[in-house]
Amino acid sequence: MERIMFRAKIHRATVTQADLDYVGSVTIDQDLLDAADILVNEKVDIWNITNGNRLHTYALSGPRGSGVIGINGAAAHLMRPGDMVIIAAFGNFTEEEARVLEPKVVLVDARNRLLELEPA
């Protein structure tokens, strides 16, 4: 049996832009994607700390060092620039893998610059 486990998150990031006219997804600074080991087009959950909204989408790469967290498409109705969010990724793991999994927690500052990596 495989289990779906939390494996990484970008914690308390600030939404920098919202674009209703974009097809969909969330644009994330590539430095943060790398730190969290989230791939382009990987499914992510976004939990809005500011207003409680939650959604599923997929990750797109933003310019390195830009701090961009861009909410695109219909999701822009749920999240606005300035909102604080958690972006989380999950994966399927065997029982053995799940028991030793050490999720990555990427902490950022107010400008979405990497502060540190912490174990979950």
From Swiss-Prot:
Q: Which GO terms describe its molecular function?
A: aspartate 1-decarboxylase activity
Task: Report the pathway entry.
Answer: Cofactor biosynthesis; (R)-pantothenate biosynthesis; beta-alanine from L-aspartate: step 1/1
Where is the protein localized?
A: Cytoplasm
Processing and modification events after translation = Is synthesized initially as an inactive proenzyme, which is activated by self-cleavage at a specific serine bond to produce a beta-subunit with a hydroxyl group at its C-terminus and an alpha-subunit with a pyruvoyl group at its N-terminus.
Give the catalysed reaction(s), semicolon-separated: L-aspartate + H(+) = beta-alanine + CO2
**What InterPro entries does the entry give?**
Asp_de-COase-like_dom_sf, Asp_decarbox
Residues reported to bind substrate: 57, 73-75
Spell out the catalytic residues: 25 (schiff-base intermediate with substrate), 58 (proton donor)
Output the superkingdom of the source species: Bacteria
- Cofactor comment text: Binds 1 pyruvoyl group covalently per subunit.
A GO cellular component annotation in the UniProt record: cytosol
Coiled-coil positions: none
Q: Which residues carry this modification: Pyruvic acid (Ser)?
A: 25
Is Glycoprotein found in the keyword set?
Answer: no
Q: Which Pfam families match?
A: Asp_decarbox
Give the UniProt keywords, A-Z.
Autocatalytic cleavage, Cytoplasm, Decarboxylase, Lyase, Pantothenate biosynthesis, Pyruvate, Schiff base, Zymogen
Q: Which cofactor does it need?
A: pyruvate
* E.C. numbers: 4.1.1.11
How would you summarize the oligomeric state and partners of this protein? Heterooctamer of four alpha and four beta subunits.
Q: Which family does it belong to?
A: Belongs to the PanD family.
> PANTHER family given for it?
ASPARTATE 1-DECARBOXYLASE (PTHR21012:SF0)
Described purpose of this protein according to its UniProt entry: Catalyzes the pyruvoyl-dependent decarboxylation of aspartate to produce beta-alanine.
Q: What is this protein called?
A: Aspartate 1-decarboxylase
What organism is recorded for this protein?
Deinococcus deserti (strain DSM 17065 / CIP 109153 / LMG 22923 / VCD115)
